[in-house]
Amino acid sequence: MILYPAIDLKDGQCVRLLRGEMEAATVFGDDPAAQAAAFEAAGCEWVHLVDLNGAFAGRPVNAAAVEAILARIAVPAQLGGGIRDMATIALWLEKGLARVILGTVAVENPGLVREAARAFPGRVAVGIDARKGRVATKGWATETDVMATDLARSFEDAGVAAIIYTDIDRDGAMAGPNIEATDALARAVSIPVIASGGVSSLADLLALRDTGSIAGAISGRALYDGALDLTQALQALRT
């Protein structure tokens, strides 16, 4: 299982939100590129980036910070937030992102996801953010009646590289991931599923790994708070 350290970008700074609330942002640093370099130095295989302003605005907002990160690191990076058309997808992939994550548009325009996955094989992921099993969009501000598992299954034949599943109520809360829901989603599809939200300890990571169904896990706050040691976690996942 791959561990993806997370860098959430708000106003050019590295922050973490509590349950997706922009007003509940904790600033962890004003040099996201240095943070990405530190994650790389610790041995991570990937970096997970989120343009929080972009998720709410529907367009890239923290482009300068993302480009600075891409210039600093050699490991692959994936980005979500505000990516809602083919031009933006193509631009980010040309700029050096390994993978883009499509969230809101996966609900509102699933045809775009299919088109992008065909155009850029292996480089398009779907972000499914759910509260009590129902998908939320537009930076989690809009709740839908779409069930997360149904949305995931709808992309089974689309060629997407991965599904990033976030349990909103666990995100940034240090309350542990929703292992049961994530495992159920992962077993419902053949697409690799990456867990996000609530990872607060090495035990949480190992519990996700031990399901045998989950391909990766994203962690942010636990790394910044020191509850999870990145080097130790990476070592544990490799054994």
From Swiss-Prot:
Family as reported in the entry's similarity comment: Belongs to the HisA/HisF family.
Protein's name according to its UniProt entry: 1-(5-phosphoribosyl)-5-[(5-phosphoribosylamino)methylideneamino] imidazole-4-carboxamide isomerase
One GO BP annotation of this record: L-tryptophan biosynthetic process
Keywords of this entry: Amino-acid biosynthesis, Cytoplasm, Histidine biosynthesis, Isomerase
Catalytic EC class: isomerase
Keyword Transmembrane attached: no
HAMAP family: HisA (MF_01014)
Pfam families (UniProt xref): His_biosynth
Species per Swiss-Prot/TrEMBL record: Cereibacter sphaeroides (strain ATCC 17029 / ATH 2.4.9)
Active site: D8, D129
Gene3D superfamilies: Aldolase class I
Gene Ontology molecular function: 1-(5-phosphoribosyl)-5-[(5-phosphoribosylamino)methylideneamino]imidazole-4-carboxamide isomerase activity
Disulfide linkage: none
Main location: cytoplasm
Catalyzed reaction equations: 1-(5-phospho-beta-D-ribosyl)-5-[(5-phospho-beta-D-ribosylamino)methylideneamino]imidazole-4-carboxamide = 5-[(5-phospho-1-deoxy-D-ribulos-1-ylimino)methylamino]-1-(5-phospho-beta-D-ribosyl)imidazole-4-carboxamide
Pathway membership: Amino-acid biosynthesis; L-histidine biosynthesis; L-histidine from 5-phospho-alpha-D-ribose 1-diphosphate: step 4/9
Localization, UniProt: Cytoplasm
E.C. numbers: 5.3.1.16
Superkingdom of origin organism: Bacteria
A cellular component term, taken from the record's GO annotations: cytoplasm
Top-level taxonomy: Bacteria, Pseudomonadati, Pseudomonadota, Alphaproteobacteria, Rhodobacterales
Gene: hisA
CDD domains per the UniProt record, alphabetical: HisA
